[in-house]
Amino acid sequence: MSIFFHEQLYRTNAVMTKLKNYPVTICGAGALGANIAENLARSGFDKLTVIDRDRIEERNLSTQPYYRSDVGAFKAKILANNLYRAIGTKVDAKTKELTPANTTQLLKDSQLIVDVFDNSVARQAVKDYAEKLSVPCLHAGLSADYAEVIWNDVYRVPSEVNDDVCDYPLARNLVMLTVAVACEAIVSFIATAEQRNFSITQKDLTVQSLFL
């Protein structure tokens, strides 16, 4: 029996084949990126790349799928190791900082980019690359009790004043809500080519479609 037996019953064989063979690059392996990577891998995606230069800190453990024994190690490497041990998925882990100078090198094989970086410079570099090469790109971000999941053509990069994301309030439930919405938007796009934008608000548990 397949590891993805239940997902396959829900999605159909045709969709599962698409998911397995669709190259996806996730930019960031923090609260959103690591959980999105795990969710996609456990949903049947088999061609994942994760880019993140950061190392695991103790404060990451409540919102990111890492262990105390992982503190100090590269997020992308540990994520790749954990997913291979769990379900045999081989994730291409790149422990590099993405900059405007190396976007082509790091993103060149992507058919879909998921941007969950925590700084505006990297987000802008991803957005510009996706626009220039017409690569589908989904951006997801959080602020207080609000989150957005938005495709590149209508996405606006936030100002640098909000870049110090390590110190802002962050609820795990909002992270996981956003992860679920982002992953469903990704699966829906691959299955149907439809690009759907969403907002998520934790206090009133609302997920709304955005028509931008």
Region locations from a protein language model:
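Hydrophobic/small residue at the entry helix of a nucleotide-binding pocket
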Residues: L32
